[in-house]
Amino acid sequence: MSDPVKTTMVASEHPCDKAFSATSIKNYIAAFFAQFGTQGMAYTLFSSYLSVVFTDYLGVNPAAIGMVLSVGVFTDIIMGNVMDRVHTKWGKARHWFFWSALPVAICVGLMFMCPVSASDTVKVIWALVLYNVYCTCLTSVRLPAFSLPSVCSDNSRTRMLLVWVASEGTNVAATVTGWIIGPIVAIYKGNPLSGWRLLGWIMAGATLLLLVLAGALLTEKRNGADLERIEAERKAMKHTEKAMGLGEQYSYLLRNKYWLLFQGGGLCNGMSLGFLIGSMGYWIQHVLGPSGLAGDNPIGLIMTVMNVPMMVAPFLILPFIKFVDAKNIVVMFMGLGAVFSLGMWACGLKIWWLFVVLMILRQCVGSCVNGSANVLLTRAIDYGEWKFGVRQEGVGSSFSSALNKVSMGVATAVLGFVLANSGYSGGGTVGESTQAALNFLFMGLPGIAMAVGTVFYGLSLGSKKWNQIRAELDERNAVQQ
């Protein structure tokens, strides 16, 4: 039996749709912790330095470790399907934070524990197995974290705030990670590998705590009886009790033009971030570090220059999100990001102050893109529900995460082959040609990718049409309840 209070409640009166209700505030904190734990600390460490540790301190061939880290894409797609099928009384996402916290933490702690005396084959197998188990476990909580704007609220402003807060969690975590890497590794001056291992276990404990806290604070809008009703409606629409197959699910997505456009823009943005983050560790160590421009802690300095602007920028435009369409924000700042990134590549380190200014500007606009783009995904999911009667938060979000992994894997594999072909065997210096390649991977390719992504995002669903779609969906739900 439906709740008489709930049946008379319009979407805008639901606690999850009120931007500053107690429920929404707890959801913002949960989104912050979720991204801090999934996209921030350990993820930042592994994205930029896992290959460095295995090549420089464990002696693994760069090309081999590059291929190992390029695997692990399909777990995202599979988990998206699982997320849409596995519901609990809490909803679609919340339970995953409790189920996955410990496995993720264990994988993080064990990642750098491979014995130095082991053969190269054993080291590669260690990295292959642990990294892919880590990716699988992380995906099981990372996708629910990505889906929070969609599962927590139907209000555009609340969704935007959820996305912004989550983005802040990523940036704060990445900055903290950048500053603690050097000091913790330096604890073991004669044996830096022990420092990396200690760092891994610190990250493991922090990840476990953050994910459990995120799950404890989270409240989804559609849970319990709501999910049962939605599932019943889908079955009635199909006139069958047979569960929707994977092919059927993707057939809906492939007919959703706005989902396809979002994935095109997401692929470009993912490639930009993939090459930027994937090459950052080597770029700092072999291009910036030898120049002496960044002082004694180049990791901390660059992470600060990259992430502090990303933390500050959202607050500067936050007052305007009620009046400016998220699509316009994404398109404008994506285009500016391309200009600034290509400007960095052209400038190089020859004019250090200009390089830093351009990096700050690029990170500011990049934060605005990352903090707004997921709103376009939630609109695409709403469009799919409006057009086909099927709401696909999990599988609809999974491709975005998979594309991020594709780009990161490609970047890591390319880096590995570039270093291997230059004769680099770990811990040594590189030639000018390798430095030029690292500059292109760190600055040139990200700029090109952002320029192409601007076109895809420019064709995405705007607020005017989305508001009409959302109103019709709310009317349908009110009648069906």
Label the model's feature ranges.
Residues 85-103, 321-336, 385-391:
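Cytoplasmic membrane-interface "Motif A"-like loop-to-helix N-cap segments
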Residues 72, 104, 161-185, 303-307, ...:
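Glycine-rich segments within core transmembrane alpha-helices of 12-TM secondary carriers
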Residues 330-373:
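C-terminal transmembrane helical hairpin of 12-TM major facilitator-type secondary transporters
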Residues 65-86, 106, 175, 304-316:
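Central cavity-lining transmembrane alpha-helices of secondary-active solute carriers
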Residues 48-63, 278-297:
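Short amphipathic helix-loop junctions that connect adjacent transmembrane helices
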Residues 62-63, 124, 150, 154-166, ...:
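Loop-to-transmembrane helix entry/capping segments in MFS-fold secondary transporters
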Residues 95-121, 335-350:
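C-terminal ends and interior cores of transmembrane alpha-helices
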Residues 1-25, 117-128, 141, 145-281, ...:
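Intracellular loop-helix junctions on the cytosolic face of multi-pass helical membrane proteins
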